[in-house]
Amino acid sequence: MPNKAVSIYYLNFNQTGTCISMGTSNGFLIFNCAPFGKFYSEDSGGYGIVEMLFSTSLLALVGIGDQPMLSPRRLRIINTKKHSIICEVTFPTKILSVKMNRSRIVVVLKEQIYIYDINNMRLLHTIEIAPNPEGLVALSCNTDTNLLAYPSPPKVISSDINPNVNTNTINIARSKSEELIANSKDNNLQNKFGTTLEGQQNIDEDKAANGYQVDQNTDTAENDINSGDVIIYDMSTLQPLMVIEAHKGEIAALNFSFDGSLIATASEKGTIIRVFSTSSGAKLYQFRRGTYPTKIYSLSFSQDNRFLSVTCSSKTVHIFKLTKTGEERTSGGADDADSDDSGNENDGDNNSVGNGDVSSLLSDNDIESTREPYVDASRKTMGRMIRNSSQKLSRRAAKTLGQLFPIKVTSILEPSRHFASLKLPTDSNISGNVKTLCSIGNEMEVDKVEYPELFDGQDQGDRTKVTMLPIRVISSEGYLYNYVLDPERGGDCLLLSQYSTAIDQ
């Protein structure tokens, strides 16, 4: 009999983008990115979550339910080096997401977030949240910041850190979502390590509803609620820090920078990407991905916070450059005129727009660069050539007008463009809806002899190497794509290599 086709249920990079974890209908696999190769696999049933802790031997596994021992409600922590199970914890409902850093493990259910101490798997906190069917959360890799982010206001935060310590009920003003009012309440949440979690707190729905400040007219109050709020939560003190009004629509993707100082967000519409400071909550950057709605799959910063990559359902990866402006902008949240829910965006697909003073964001080197952005010959179409020419004229006009008008006006005049992009070499007719994730690596040197297309007539001198930025993309088809980006020129990313995970196990 022919072997049954293997399905991919989970695919992700580790925190540094150096390894890939994969869950399939047959088992799970771990790959090294450079050099590419499989270094661990286990054929023991279907897995829906396979999360790594950096490049350590610690793995968090959740099954798909095809076997009694692989329930989607059971979290299993294993040590791949010792081939041992560290612990197992069963939850009341299906596990949607698991995130780890060196001090915390976060387990996300549809309406709860469980926070554990990674050193002893002691339950520290349980956060009751509004329904989060996608299990969308972000956890900072850096334990110095140690932040958690999740969409929508929470109902109740309960804890059993110490038996005599009361925890907080958070009341959020839905109109602006800025005031966090703490009311003490004793919670008796019981946790038995390695067994089913019992005694979960019964939520008083009436009190939870009264925790929100609403108008007498319920319908009007509900219509005024922004569903794109993001809670920033301190994982060290186990207290909420702030509410960021990121978007008017529901959050589709969010992620922290490596140091935890920035957080990027995208709404379900997928046209606007925003970057906020996690210390002040201020919006620092705003990028426009394009006109047409699309599903955003991932947001990823470079480790030096210079670049932000965005993957989406169009199989295009956009890379935006976060230009340092010398001082932090303090523009508002989702109520700006260029909101992603306004419905009047008419720039072309694969475009971006920054937010703030044009003269500060666009330097002379950006406008009159002596080295034009690299253009991939396979993507050189008449439409792209016309659009690039138009963007150059727009940038010059915006720079001139930006010196005459205030910031609010110049942010509208600012040109729409991304810094770099790439298009995956997949057959759209066959691939269908391919999910992609991206990771930006550290700068490396590329030899001229191996890649002469990176050196054109505009380059001066006898250079034999050029500094490039590696861009890694993995797809739900089971492929790893290695691209490089010129961090000074931008433009199209160049495909260096492509590998298949060959999930025949």
UniProtKB/Swiss-Prot annotation:
Report the subcellular localization.
Preautophagosomal structure membrane; Vacuole membrane; Endosome membrane
Instruction: Specify residue ranges for compositional bias: Low complexity.
Output: 349-360
Q: Where is this motif: L/FRRG motif?
A: 287-291
Q: Where are stretches of biased composition, namely Basic and acidic residues? A: 368-379
Query: What keywords are assigned to this protein?
Result: Autophagy, Endosome, Membrane, Protein transport, Repeat, Transport, Vacuole, WD repeat
What biological processes does GO assign it? Answer: cytoplasm to vacuole targeting by the Cvt pathway; late endosome to vacuole transport; pexophagy; piecemeal microautophagy of the nucleus; positive regulation of vacuole organization; vacuolar protein processing
Q: Where is this region: Disordered?
A: 328-380
Q: Which residues cross the membrane?
A: none
**SMART domains referenced in this protein's UniProt entry, alphabetically:** WD40 (SM00320)
Any one Gene Ontology cellular component term annotated for this protein:
PAS complex
Per the record, membrane topology reads: Peripheral membrane protein
Which InterPro entries does this one have?
PROPPIN, WD40/YVTN_repeat-like_dom_sf, WD40_repeat_dom_sf, WD40_rpt
* WD repeat boundaries on the chain: 246-286, 291-330
Q: Which GO terms describe its molecular function?
A: phosphatidylinositol-3,5-bisphosphate binding; phosphatidylinositol-3-phosphate binding; phosphatidylinositol-4-phosphate binding; ubiquitin binding
Which residue intervals are annotated with compositional bias (Acidic residues) in the record?
Answer: 335-348
**Where's it mainly located?**
membrane
- What is known about its subunit structure? Component of the PI(3,5)P2 regulatory complex.
In the record's own words, the domains note is: The N-terminus might form a beta-propeller domain involved in specific binding to phosphatidylinositol 3,5-bisphosphate (PIP2), leading to the association of the protein to the membrane.
Q: Which PANTHER family match?
A: WD-REPEAT PROTEIN INTERACTING WITH PHOSPHOINOSIDES WIPI -RELATED
Function recorded in the entry:
The PI(3,5)P2 regulatory complex regulates both the synthesis and turnover of phosphatidylinositol 3,5-bisphosphate (PtdIns(3,5)P2). Necessary for proper vacuole morphology. Plays an important role in osmotically-induced vacuole fragmentation. Required for cytoplasm to vacuole transport (Cvt) vesicle formation, pexophagy and starvation-induced autophagy. Involved in correct ATG9 trafficking to the pre-autophagosomal structure. Might also be involved in premeiotic DNA replication.
Family in the record: Belongs to the WD repeat PROPPIN family.
The name on file for this protein is Autophagy-related protein 18
Q: Which organism is it from?
A: Candida glabrata (strain ATCC 2001 / BCRC 20586 / JCM 3761 / NBRC 0622 / NRRL Y-65 / CBS 138)
